A protein has these predicted regions:
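Short, glycine/acidic-rich hinge or "gate" loops at secondary-structure transitions
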Residues: 250-257, 271, 449-452, 479-497, ...
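Post-HEXXH active-site segment of zinc metalloproteases
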Residues: 443-464
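Extended, compositionally biased alpha-helical segments that mediate assembly or anchoring
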Residues: 556-687
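Short alpha-helix carrying the canonical HExxH Zn2+-binding catalytic motif
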Residues: 425-438
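Long, well-structured alpha-helical subdomains associated
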Residues: 23, 52, 58, 80, ...
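An active-site-proximal "capping" alpha-helix that borders the catalytic cofactor pocket
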Residues: 31, 249, 459-476
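Contiguous, non-catalytic segments that form substrate-binding/exosite surfaces or channel walls
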Residues: 91, 99-212, 219-417, 424
Length: 687
């Protein structure tokens, strides 16, 4: 395969998904030591694959196992409509790491019947008894999870109309556990914190699942070696230990050692240690994410989804982000927010443009284009943050979208299309830089305000805050002075694209009649609809049908400034009520007529609204017993890769939570009290 044609190349398309390839430019030129660091970090990324499947739903590993067994062993009538539908369902399960849509959160509707599935399973059980060792009761339960529309309809519920925990099927909480009980549990932990924990608060609940005893007492099943997901964490840790031999810096080695201690013990203090060392290590060329990181999938915003990612710094492109970081204090001082909420001295803000080398967990197959970590506000305030803009993912998306007809279909004004053609690629990446590097790194909480005060609305608030910061500064003359934009018109491309996406084009991803659910989509809708409301009042923005017109871009910047000021206030003061009201007003409901027209126009283009990626296959080349190279293969197909990952990186039992209960059964409070009484009687009789 000609590697020059790899970026953005289509691998397969199914349902509402198109799978692409990305290219690791410059990998061949790396020294062997650095290639081996990438290799071992990548292996640790693959080893966590089963974790994200189980976190996304308690039946996912069993469903994946059954479907993969059928896919690889059922050899009769594979051309029928029902088998093709079953194949597509499996493809969707692979992509979403579960049976719910990776963006919309709704459960997939199978286009094959339960009778068809059960017939195949029964046949395979007769012919290959050891392949599918499930009882009739177990299979009935699994079939109900797949086919019953009233059961687990949504992975993450964010509507606020019901108990968010009970209404969500993500596997962070036992069935029957309610939102108020969880909030009380973690509030008690915060109230009982000692002085050290108050000074350096752990991210309560990040690496655990909430279970309950027979009498309803809550307790944590901690993700650690010897605990829940222990088998996977042992294997992840083994590859991290292998990586220690090839680290870029001594600080990177120390960070990995803290991460290993965290996986070994489950102690969140070790995770804080890891984050502090990781964020201070800015000299690395090869860096990584590995852990229970983002909390978007948890309706309460506490539980981290397992994620792995490896990337290589692009030193030339990073000159752009270096300029931004050096000016962090200037940007903070000039931000249009209340001075009380500004950082007095922004610390440790670093940013790079990177080439992703491997994706895993919550970042695979769908992946972000930019990342800013760590998430703990106190670490960001005291030690800073690291941001990355992922250039080869940007490039793959750009290549895949060339001449796809979207702009011609949704932008009537030829001058606007020309504006976007000229500046879009540049402003898109710069907006990501500003969002990740400065947006997430800006502002501070008022004294005594909990970082969890905004609850289920925290993720939308945080993404809106970062986007607004980037949008506001995109039009600033300071970017021209820094040489980051070519002229004073470039920012208009960013503004137009952002509003068009938030008001119109992102709706192609949502089924007619549904609400906006995903945090990033809600954020974009909130900002764009607020701006449109202001623009209508002042005659600066119009939306006639699907035709967007912006007549005063300077006024639009003012709207962004006003909204940023309020969004920052909500976070800094922990104003849950105001945040909820704003999100529910601007970011959830969709006008049905507009939505129908968007979908009709989009359908004519025959495009897939969601995209993701297969990874390059990375293998060691030996001469004798010596490793002489790490080679990349860009030819692996989608199903081929998914089946290989299941063969080579299956680390967990089919029902990890059940296995954990058998390993660590928790008695009820009543049982403990009886045991206490018996011990007292025994001591008394011995006396």
């Amino acid at each position: 395969m000609n590697k020059l044609n790899i970026a953005g190349q289509s691998v397969i398309r199914f349902a509402d998904i198109e799978v692409l390839r990305y290219q690791i430019d410059g990998f061949e030129a790396l020294p062997l030591k650095r290639k081996l660091l990438v290799y071992h970090l990548s292996q640790s990324t693959f080893a966590g694959r089963d974790i994200i499947f189980d976190q996304n739903g308690r039946y996912n590993l069993r469903i994946r196992h059954i479907l993969e067994t059928i896919y690889t062993h059922y050899e009769v009538a594979r051309e029928t409509d029902e088998f093709v539908a079953l194949e597509e369902y499996l493809y969707r399960v692979w992509f979403a790491s579960g049976i719910h849509h990776h963006y919309g959160c709704d459960k997939f509707v199978p286009n094959f019947s339960q009778a068809y599935l059960s017939g195949i399973v029964e046949g395979l059980q007769r012919e290959h008894a050891l392949l599918l060792e499930y009882s009739e009761d177990e299979l009935a339960d699994i079939y109900a999870e797949i086919f019953d529309p009233t059961r687990s309809p949504k992975s993450t519920e964010q509507s606020g109309e019901a108990d968010l925990v009970e209404a969500s099927s993500v596997n962070f909480y036992d069935r029957g556990v309610g939102q108020k009980a969880v909030e009380a549990y973690y509030q008690a932990l915060q109230d009982e914190a000692d002085e050290d924990e108050r000074q350096a608060p752990p991210s309560y609940g990040l690496n655990s699942r909430i279970a309950q005893t027979a009498d309803g007492t809550l307790y944590e099943q901690v993700y650690k070696q010897g605990g829940l997901y222990g088998e996977a964490l042992y294997r992840i840790s083994a590859h991290l230990k292998d990586a220690l031999e090839y680290v870029d810096t001594e600080m990177q080695a120390e960070a990995i050692k803290s991460l290993l201690a965290y996986y070994r013990t489950g102690n969140l203090k070790h995770y804080n240690d890891f984050c502090i060392k990781w964020v201070q290590d800015t000299a690395v060329s090869v860096d990584f994410i590995n852990g229970f990181t983002e909390v978007y999938a948890d309706p309460l915003g506490l539980k981290g989804s397992w994620e792995g990612l490896v990337h290589i710094k692009n030193p030339i492109a990073s000159e752009r982000t270096d300029k931004i970081c050096r000016e962090a204090k200037w940007f903070e001082e000039h931000a249009p927010i209340d001075d009380r909420f500004k950082k007095a001295e922004p610390k440790g803000i670093s940013a790079s443009v990177v080439t992703v080398a491997m994706l895993g967990g919550d970042s695979y197959p769908a992946t972000p284009i930019g990342i800013n970590l760590p998430n703990a506000d106190w670490i960001r305030a005291e030690y800073g943050s690291k941001s990355v803009t992922i250039d080869n993912i940007h490039a793959a998306y750009r290549e895949a979208s060339r001449h796809n007809g979207m702009d011609a279909a949704f932008i009537a004004d030829a001058e606007v299309r020309a504006l976007l053609e000229r500046y879009d690629g540049l402003t898109d990446e710069l907006h990501t830089d500003l969002h990740e590097c400065l947006g997430h790194g800006s502002g501070q909480l008022s004294p005594g305000v909990s970082p969890d005060a905004l609850g289920a609305y925290a993720s939308v608030n945080e993404e809106a805050r970062a986007d607004l910061f980037a949008l506001y500064y995109m039009a600033d003359e300071h970017l021209l002075e820094l040489g980051l934009l070519p002229d004073a018109d470039a920012y208009k491309a960013c503004y137009y694209r952002y509003l068009l996406n938030g008001l119109v084009t992102q709706l192609v991803r949502i089924p007619l009649g549904a609400n906006i659910e995903e945090a990033h989509m809600r954020n974009r809708a909130l900002i764009a609809r607020y701006a449109l409301e202001r623009g209508k009042q002042e005659g600066t923005i119009e939306l006639n049908g699907l035709d967007l017109k912006i007549t005063n871009y300077e006024a639009l910047r003012g709207y962004f400034a006003d909204l940023l000021r309020e969004v920052q206030r909500m976070k800094s003061e922990g104003d849950f009520a105001a945040c909820k009201q704003m999100v529910e007003r601007y970011a959830v409901q969709i006008d049905a007529d507009l939505h129908e027209e968007v979908l009709k126009r989009y359908k004519s283009l025959n495009l897939a609204p969601y995209k993701g990626f297969v990874n390059p296959k990375m293998t060691l080349r030996y001469e004798g017993e010596a490793i002489v190279d790490v080679e990349l293969d860009y030819t692996e197909a989608y199903a081929e890769q998914m089946l290989r990952y299941s063969r080579e990186y299956w680390t967990l039992p089919l029902n990890p939570v059940q296995e954990e209960r058998l390993r660590d059964p928790r008695p009820s409070a009543k049982t403990l009290e009886k045991a206490k009484e018996l011990r007292a009687k025994l001591r008394h009789s011995m006396d």
